[in-house]
Amino acid sequence: MKFIAAVPNFSEGRRLDIVDEIANAMAKTPGVKLLAKESDPSHNRSVITIGGDPDSVLEACIIGVKKAVELIDLTKHKGEHPRIGACDVLPFVPFGTSTMDDAKALAEQAGKIIAEELGIPVYFYEESARRPERVDLAYIRNRQFETVRDKVAEDPDLEPDLGPKQLHPTAGAVMVGARKPLIAFNVNLGTTNVEIAKEIAKHLRSKTGGLAFVKALG
């Protein structure tokens, strides 16, 4: 049996009852196992990891996106992490006998459902990107919900790959893609000076001359 993991990121990390409701709804899907659930109140963001056969994982992810649309209002969201959606990022990761093409096909299916059935615009990134500049998740996402919402109708650079040409008023858009496994972690610094954190991140980040393939946010 092919195994696919999905690691949706949700723009809620403080109201843990909401996070639990989303995670539990996804975990009830037959054929899916909840592998991890992590919340960060400073980022106001949660990462939920599920795994299973491709069809079951797809079904669970759509359930998670629907719950996020129902329970998360980005107009009231504040946090340290960039975001453009209630379900902000939806990556599919192949494991075992699954291939990147399997993950890409699943990302395409998910994007189509999110755009056509839920009416939420979709941007494809990483291996699923339809424009070379959008391989980098940050290219769209770092502009933040408010900026993309206000400029998407007039800026061709912000046009979604699928779905409406305007963001959902409270749920924004979803970044969907296939990617390789990713290790993400936080480092606590012994200072309250955010400029020090930004400088360290700059030296680590590949985009600004640091280590290859490393992304960093200070």
Language model segments and positions:
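Short amphipathic alpha-helices in soluble, non-transmembrane regions
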Residues: 22, 60-67, 104-111, 199-203
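Short, conserved charged micro-motifs
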Residues: 14-18, 55-60, 98-105, 192-199
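Acidic/histidine-enriched active-site and ligand-binding environments that engage anionic O-linkages
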Residues: 66, 72-76, 111-121
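Extracellular glycan-interaction surfaces
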Residues: 48
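Active-site cofactor/substrate anionic-group-binding motifs, chiefly glycine-
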Residues: 22-29, 33, 37-38, 52-83
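Residues forming well-ordered secondary-structure scaffolds
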Residues: 101-109, 113, 117, 180
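A structural signal for small-residue-enriched, beta-sheet-centric alpha/beta enzyme cores
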Residues: 2-14, 19, 30-45, 78-93, ...
